Amino acid sequence: MNKSFILSTGSYLPKKKLGNDEIALMVETSDEWIRQRTGITQRYIADEAELTSDLAVNSAKNAIEKAQISVDEIGLIIVATTTPDKTLPSCATIAQNKLKCKNAFSFDVQAACSGFIYAVTIADSLIKSNDRIKYALVIGAEIMSRIVDWKDRSTCVLFGDGAGAVIMKSTAHCNEMTENSTRGIISTNLYSDGNVDVLCTKGGISSTGDSGKIYMNGREVFKHAVDKLTASIEETLRCNNLKITDIDWLVPHQANIRIIEAVVKKLNFLMEKVINTVDQHANTSAASIPLALDYAIQKPKIKPGSLGILVAIGAGLTWGSVLLRY
């Protein structure tokens, strides 16, 4: 049966770093307050001239180079983002133009912080159903600093900018089947519940004429995040007849170290098997998981043949997970 696997990863972070002490000069907070409650020490901020598509393209080039493929071989491009360059066209088609990728079809996915999970799931389904797609480029890219209220200390300390990308390959185009037969996306699950008020923007194009700024009910988000991330992982294990001890690594959405620790405790998982970049990247929304995945593979904390789970939750609420063998 045709399936997909992650061939390569890439990432891009803007040059500017914004530390907690610098934020403390903007709002009433402190490095200690931010660290204790979130685990975040810094975040990256895009230059005024940078667009989300620029971040996406830079991460894509990194992944394409590692995959050692031509852009002409890419048949599908999906960009997961909440902060596109324009209302239309999609960020994916803009990135496609900048990459000079002529043979793909492209579109955006908007599922907030769960966007990359949604995008990988869609790409996997399209690869399985379309033998003509040899390679898919899946990107999570965000400039969250543009929709943050920098006067709201409860949210402005949480977010950062960045992009991560993966090249997914179809096994229908593999000559090296003995090498890649065990690699691949094994299962995915996606959910949403329409609980829109706990995490949203105060405004939008059709309601206020602008993108709006982020609003969050922190306590409610924490409770939902811990319960839903845990349940998604448990469902993945149940559906695949696995135990938590079978999992070699976990890449959770990098929102808050306290959420990650609470999920790990409920699962009775080992914290040393968890990929954690929230301290350096902060919450980069849809870019969070591909950034962390690329970091872990480069270290290498994720090694070929290992079994792992990607899991995220975002506004909507939306959540889900991907089980894969790298």
Swiss-Prot record:
Say which domain of life the source belongs to.
Bacteria
- The record's top EC class is transferase
The reaction(s) catalysed by this protein are: malonyl-[ACP] + acetyl-CoA + H(+) = 3-oxobutanoyl-[ACP] + CO2 + CoA
Q: What are the GO cellular component annotations?
A: cytoplasm
CDD domains linked: KAS_III (cd00830)
Localization per record: Cytoplasm
Pathway field of the UniProt record reads: Lipid metabolism; fatty acid biosynthesis
One GO molecular-function entry: beta-ketoacyl-acyl-carrier-protein synthase III activity
**Gene3D superfamilies this protein is in?**
3.40.47.10
**A matching Pfam family:** ACP_syn_III_C
Which GO biological process annotations does it have? fatty acid biosynthetic process; secondary metabolite biosynthetic process
Q: Which UniProt keywords apply?
A: Acyltransferase, Cytoplasm, Fatty acid biosynthesis, Fatty acid metabolism, Lipid biosynthesis, Lipid metabolism, Multifunctional enzyme, Transferase
The keyword DNA repair appears for this protein:
no
Q: Does the keyword Endoplasmic reticulum apply?
A: no
Region (ACP-binding): which ranges? 254-258
Q: What is its EC number?
A: 2.3.1.180
* Subunit record text: Homodimer.
- Free-text domain note: The last Arg residue of the ACP-binding site is essential for the weak association between ACP/AcpP and FabH.
The function of this protein is: Catalyzes the condensation reaction of fatty acid synthesis by the addition to an acyl acceptor of two carbons from malonyl-ACP. Catalyzes the first condensation reaction which initiates fatty acid synthesis and may therefore play a role in governing the total rate of fatty acid production. Possesses both acetoacetyl-ACP synthase and acetyl transacylase activities. Its substrate specificity determines the biosynthesis of branched-chain and/or straight-chain of fatty acids.
Q: Which PANTHER family match?
A: 3-OXOACYL-[ACYL-CARRIER-PROTEIN] SYNTHASE 3 (PTHR34069), BETA-KETOACYL-[ACYL-CARRIER-PROTEIN] SYNTHASE III (PTHR34069:SF2)
Name the family.
Answer: Belongs to the thiolase-like superfamily. FabH family.
What is the protein name stated in its UniProt record? Beta-ketoacyl-[acyl-carrier-protein] synthase III
Its lineage opens with: Bacteria, Pseudomonadati, Pseudomonadota, Alphaproteobacteria, Rickettsiales
Record gene name = fabH
